[in-house]
Amino acid sequence: MDSNVTFKYGANDIAAQLRREINSGILQRFERLPPERSLSLKFNVSRGTIRAAINKLETEGLVTIKAGSGTYILKKYQVKIAA
């Protein structure tokens, strides 16, 4: 196996990491997410991959996207446990 191979994040991986940052308090409720460009550099992926991750979080109700303003955190991610 080539030791120079680096892990490439996918949209699901990035969404999961952002969820962890929200739950741990690194990212706070009503705080604006970093710009897509910053996130794409952080995760070494395209802005399209970042958009897909953010859209996933929006579908889950964790963030809201405000055109021209940014993406804002609405709430913490809650795992539902079956009784």
Predicted regions and their residues:
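Short linear motifs at protein or domain termini
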Residues: M1-A83
